[in-house]
Swiss-Prot record:
GO terms for molecular function: adenosylhomocysteinase activity. Pathway: Amino-acid biosynthesis; L-homocysteine biosynthesis; L-homocysteine from S-adenosyl-L-homocysteine: step 1/1. Substrate binds at residues 63, 138, 198, 228, 232. It is found in: Cytoplasm. This is Adenosylhomocysteinase. It comes from Methylococcus capsulatus (strain ATCC 33009 / NCIMB 11132 / Bath). One of its GO terms (biological process) is S-adenosylmethionine cycle. NAD(+) binds at residues 199-201, 233, 262-267, 285, 320, 341-343, 386. The keyword NAD applies.
């Protein structure tokens, strides 16, 4: 079948180029061979169709791996509308392949902020003037749009004082929708059974909403499943960070001083990859436990004030705001590389650098010319470097994350009534199931407990093997 011809009468999408669909389909087929968890879930649940009746609004990087997730959700009965959760992260051939198969997708690499929020609205608009009943989120923007819009219907002052360019665009988009369709956000919010959240930043938003009594539906924190955070965040970043830096700059990493800001799971993976390629790695941390971990691994733990004029490569991985400041950047060495692997672009004070001359080298690579004549290299305008300058994490590790997402969607859609408006994590037995589904692919074989051994340590032979408080 000609995928592009198949999509000729289907216009509920916005992608860069539908003619890329064939290329995308070939890469999706390869990715499926590296995503055993998702393929096993398709096989296990296809007949039961547990997501039949689900209308899932998806806001997650529109990559080849995400295409496999989308098609898994559809195979289990769901209707899906999709947008990317980052303006630079879309792989256009992946989006084209999904659109060519008649699935509404709104994403292209290099979106404007206006388009970004327009597309996030589009995933909430379903034929027949109905909305989604599930959200699958990465970073929390789809959830934010629905909940902030509903609150602004009652208190317009919430949109009065944007603190950055992104908020200016978001608030304007909400005001426009409020004028055109009064009460629309509240109707959408009322129809949502639950949300599953992919990443650290989005989970932080959910817990904030819960603490303030503003979470209007149940949420599952996928990020803190062990098979997500200890694999995607650690091993995924260990491979995709240096892929992004090298594709963008062709720089030799060996011999350089690299600073990783933040030593959580993401920072740990970044530090390992940079050290593995021969860099001297320094760490900045606010948490004494993480700082001690870094020091015990042989990294030098410093402050940015100490490091800013000495290092060659800077990577933010904190999930915080303003960790690399204007004052840090103006002190940096000539040709210092600055990038971010946290979800949002707020970790680096990019806006403060707009006062200087910018020279675009190629897409997502800019020279910022400082008054002293030195130039620093900013990657992906401070957004996710591994997706802006490369293609993100490998398929295998994303299979772990997306298998969790699929199981979480099934759980909330099928059993949502038993959940309060709180944030939950998937139970340990499902975490272990996700891991088990991936062992055969990499040639790993489990040892089985004897009855005597299981009784001795007090666990079932089939698991779970660890208590919920166990730290892997």
């Amino acid at each position: 079948m000609n995928a592009v011809a198949n999509a000729a009468s289907f216009d509920d999408h916005k992608v860069a180029d539908l003619s890329l669909a064939g290329w995308g389909r070939k890469e999706i087929a390869i990715a499926e061979t590296e995503m055993p968890g998702l393929m096993a879930i398709r096989e296990e649940y296809r007949a039961a169709q547990p997501l039949k009746g689900a209308r899932i609004a998806g806001s997650l990087h529109m990559t080849i791996q995400t295409a496999v997730l989308i098609e898994t959700l559809v195979a289990l009965g769901a209707e899906v509308r999709w947008a990317s959760c980052n303006i630079f992260s879309t792989q256009d051939h992946a989006a084209a392949a999904i659109a060519a198969d008649g699935i509404p997708v709104f994403a292209y690499k290099g979106e404007s902020l206006d388009d970004y929020w327009e597309y996030t609205h589009r995933i909430l608009e379903w034929p027949g003037d109905v909305g989604p009943n599930m959200i699958l989120d990465d970073g929390g923007d789809a959830t934010l749009l629905v909940t902030l819009g509903a609150r602004a219907e009652k208190d317009a002052s919430l949109l009065a004082n944007p603190t950055c360019e992104e908020e200016e665009v978001l608030f304007a988009a909400i005001r426009k929708r409020l004028a055109a369709k009064p009460g629309w956000y509240s109707r959408i919010q009322a129809g949502i059974k639950g949300v599953t959240e992919e990443t650290t930043t989005g989970v932080h938003r959910l817990y904030e909403m819960q603490a303030k009594g503003r979470l209007p539906f149940p949420a599952i924190n996928v990020n803190d499943s062990v098979t997500k955070s200890k694999f995607d965040n650690l091993y995924g970043c260990r491979e995709s960070l240096v892929d992004g830096i090298k594709r963008a700059t062709d720089v030799m990493i060996a011999g350089k001083i690299a600073v990783v800001l933040g030593y959580g799971d993401v920072g740990k993976g970044c530090a390992q990859s940079l050290r593995g390629l021969g860099a001297t790695v320094w760490i900045t941390e606010i948490d004494p436990i993480c700082a001690l971990q870094a020091a015990m691994e042989g990294y030098r733990v410093v402050t940015m004030d100490e490091a800013c004029d000495k290092a060659d490569i800077f990577v933010t991985a904190t999930g915080n705001v303003g960790v690399i400041t204007h004052d840090h950047m103006v002190k940096m060495k000539d040709q210092a590389i600055v990038c971010n692997i946290g979800h949002f672009d707020s970790e680096i004070e990019v806006a403060a650098m707009r006062q200087y001359t910018w020279e675009n080298i190629k897409p997502q690579v800019d020279h910022i010319v400082l008054p002293n004549g030195r130039r620093i290299i900013l990657l992906a305008e401070g957004r996710l470097v591994n997706l802006g300058c490369a293609t993100g994490h490998p398929s295998f590790v994303m299979s772990n994350s997306f298998t969790n997402q699929t199981l979480a969607q099934i759980e909330l859609f099928c059993h949502g009534a038993k959940y309060e408006n709180k944030v939950y994590v998937l139970p340990k037995h499902l975490d272990e199931k996700v891991a088990r589904l991936h062992l055969k692919k990499i040639g790993a074989r489990l040892t089985e407990l004897s009855d005597e051994q299981a009784a001795y340590i007090g666990v079932p032979k089939e698991g779970p093997y660890k208590p919920d408080h166990y730290r892997y």
